[in-house]
């Protein structure tokens, strides 16, 4: 299961926590990139936030990973499930064909 994770800052974090949070974020990314759970990760230019592609076996695994996200308390997080485009297009074609008028 693949998910697009988007995070944006919703509240400033205390300055005294800044360095620790950045270092924790570096560790979190390294841990999950090296395990293959995070495929891609990036920051947004000019914004306090970023995103990535996370691959997990279950929603519970995704929840566990995101519970460790260091900036979680200071972020709005959006998670979107990703589906294969070709499979989605095939499903759409079948739906359209099923709704089309049939000659009797």
Can you name each region flagged by the protein language model?
Residues 1-104:
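Conserved, structured core segments of small domains
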